[in-house]
From Swiss-Prot:
It comes from Azoarcus sp. (strain BH72). This is Glutamate--tRNA ligase. Monomer. A motif ('HIGH' region) lies at residues 12-22. It holds the Pfam family Anticodon_2. Its EC number is 6.1.1.17. The lineage of its organism: Bacteria, Pseudomonadati, Pseudomonadota, Betaproteobacteria, Rhodocyclales. InterPro entries: aa-tRNA-synth_I_cd-bd, aa-tRNA-synth_I_codon-bd_sub2, aa-tRNA-synth_I_CS, aa_tRNA-synth_I_cd-bd_sf, Glu-tRNA-ligase_bac/mito, Glu/Gln-tRNA-synth, Glu/Gln-tRNA-synth_Ib_cat-dom, GluQ/Sye.
Amino acid sequence: MAATPVRTRFAPSPTGYLHIGGARTALFSWAYARRHGGRFILRIEDTDVARSTPEAVQAILDGMKWLGLEHDEGPFYQMQRMDRYKEVIQQMLAAGTAYYCYTSKEELDALRAEQEAKKEKPRYDGRWRPAPGKTLPTPPAGVQPVVRFCNPTTGVVAWDDLVKGRIEISNTELDDFIIARADGTPTYNFCVVVDDWDMGITQVIRGDDHVNNTPRQINVLQALGASVPQYAHLSMILGDDGTKLSKRHGAVSVMQYDDEGYLPEAVINYLARLGWSHGDDEIFSREQFVEWFDLDHITPSAAQFNTEKLNWLNAHYIKQADNAYLAAEVANRLARRGVDPEAGPALEQVVALYKDRSANLNELADAAELFCVDVHAAPEVIAQHLTDTARAALASLRARFEAVAWDKAALNQAIKDTMAEHGLKMPQVAIPLRVALLGVPQTPSIDAVVEVLGRERVLARLARHLG
């Protein structure tokens, strides 16, 4: 008998941005489907009408696209499936696996207070649940009932969690939860079940904040005669300080990492190592990750987010990246700043100079901007470095630059000849030259900077300071 094709899903609620925890869930679900030749489904759980927004949906789609987590089916929207949910609820009412409940809020509040006074766990008491020989109250006039699920009253719900191991919950711990509100709208736990059933989901990979939902969802699936998927609940992500990851730990939105100059390849690599490992391997490609990924090596303990490690990874990926790719990314960032990317030398040349000393794309763009815009150094920097002695040396050097062959070796010799003429050491010429050309005292090798900047720009910028 052929194995059931793998079908995983990512099902975010569009009430905000795509955060790091959600991105990791999406990555693991996507990788599992790719590893097993399966299908990855994107589902938007937008039943919280008050908080769901089109902007949040777009932010999720943008984040997925930036990370390169392409879905095979979807996105499916729960609000577009309401008729299907209501159809299944009617089937359950007819089958006796669900029932109408007319208990008012006041009655539920009184029941809760009574149970709490007795130190009992608050739960619905089943007063409207049909049973053989039981006479139900007369439905009150003008009251719209909710629909509750007939949760089993005996036995246990058990599943072998692919991360946490065997989990068993006694059905006596669960009550008859609401699957449709009084206005007829189905609840989250019910919609999820119908979606997973209809979409043939085989593995549900999600955060462990959903563990408590799982026994209820399994019971509904079994009541529907549906196949129960395997579940894998991922541990939470903690911040650098060991507390739950939040805004105070820095960027939490995936697209914020784009804004801050991280490469998607670096973020993917880092997310992959948040709770999963393959021996001591720290750096690997997306393709290698898919080949290696399994659920057996996901740790059940909380993962800790380490910004320094992410920064280290990002710097590594920038060093290894193709110069043309980096130049295109830098050009986009310059354009967003209002800087013409074509106002300076070829960005690929600038990128080649600076990629080994840049931790992110924004640092690369900062450097490139100095080549595109004639930057004026701060007055105190000019006062410190462009002394009369330095200006005299730069005037001699400018004259040499007018005639010299424009290659690194010849430019280096021109600088050395100027040093000899004025009795100066390399820093006494190179630092003022950096300040005059780029407005900063520190750059890569000065002869390389001069070569890339080009004769016309070098002469013009020197003339401005010597005028």
